[in-house]
Amino acid sequence: MTIARKVLSIGMAGSFAMMLAACTTSGPDAPPMAAAPKGVEGSWIDAKGTGLSTFTAGKFATVATDTGQKLADGSYTMTGATSVEINGTSLIRQTPVSFNCLLISTSQLNCTSSSGQNFVLTRRT
């Protein structure tokens, strides 16, 4: 019977050691990964680098990269998985602006103004 008790004690000690090992950590957690961009949310710069447009929660604003002066603001609506409609006001000209854009990749937005002018915005990270 004493042999059976020893075997049982060793088995219990082994189980207890395994439970303790499961409670320990192997070191600091890895830093959280940045969330992938969702739709057009974020900052975009034009091809010439003169205007920075920021899209957040259905609103957009464009500022001059050299002075920070606000050039335009308004709203945007995702009209499909990769298409967006942008409407607002040019604050310099005090005229309405309207654009349709296609999200070509997570970092490129191809746009056409209501007057037919094409331009490309690149996501700023």
UniProtKB/Swiss-Prot annotation:
Q: What is this protein called?
A: Outer membrane lipoprotein omp10 homolog
Keyword Signal (UniProt): yes
| Family, per entry | Belongs to the rhizobiaceae omp10 lipoprotein family.
Write down any Gene Ontology CC term.
cell outer membrane
Q: Where is the lipid attached (N-palmitoyl cysteine)?
A: 23
Q: How does it sit in the membrane?
A: Lipid-anchor
Annotated lipid attachment (S-diacylglycerol cysteine): 23
Enumerate the subcellular locations listed in this protein's record, separating them with semicolons: Cell outer membrane
Keyword Lipoprotein assigned to the entry: answer is yes
Give the signal sequence positions: 1-22
Organism of origin = Mesorhizobium japonicum (strain LMG 29417 / CECT 9101 / MAFF 303099) (Mesorhizobium loti (strain MAFF 303099))
